[in-house]
Amino acid sequence: MIQTEKDIHSIQELYRQRAQEFQANSERLHSKYQRFALVRLLAFFGSVALIILIWQYSGLAGIVAIVVFLLAFYRFMTWHQAIKREQEHQAELALINQNELATLDHDFTMFADGAAYQDPLHPNSIDLDLFGPYSFYQYTNRTSTALGANYLASMLTTNVDSTTIQKRQASIKELSADLEWRQHFLAYGRKAEDTLEQVNLLKKWIKQAPFIIPNRLLRALLILMPILTTAVFAWFLYQQQFFFGVLSLLPALALLRKHVLKVNSVHEQTTHAEKALRHYALLIKHIETKGFETEHLQDL
């Protein structure tokens, strides 16, 4: 019993230290992001003023300055947003460790209880407290995506043979030894904010025939039209012929109008899943960083 208490205290200290470390990292990155947000604002207005000044001396030099500014500002924005994403990731890691600290005091309320998966017709769904408050599902639930939550419920309600059970136990043992990898994986998934409805819409979209790839002319126009439109528009602005500059946009608008219904249909099926897909990619990338030893994990 004394040894058990020592083990619990050691685990508590581990989670407490990790929570403090990740929280400190999050606060440091947040301060850095805020500082450079001001720099970004000043750089934007300063660059606009500089471009106006250059344009007064030379329209061509002004166009070059605009292109350089857009490229530089895009790179800066990308770097700045990367700081924000890492800050949010560190904050998630801090919260994960705080949650695990709470579980050592028998508080599992921060985890979904899976009540939606209760099935009165299932022989063990209710009488074994598989789902609902203080259920086995809530006790074991460390899923971070809708697909993961659904898969866990399926595992608890589907009979499997002893060989499969042994493979799962071996994979659990392997993963239990790598706290760092597990928590980063969980943190990436927690930001996905996916739903089964989004997943079903994506599956429906994937099964649809593409309307761009088979059309060679459309593929060529997708590449050439933005380049030509931008070049012609910039030339008319340089010549101060604004009316013709506006007219140069009409071919691109006509092409867009022709395909707008199809584009809107694709947008409807994918727009809400963009964030989820981005985080699915992070999860897959994180899986690829680890070489698994057990057969069950290698088959993923």
PLM regions: where:
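Alpha-helical bundle segments enriched in helix-capping/polar residues
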Residues: 2-300
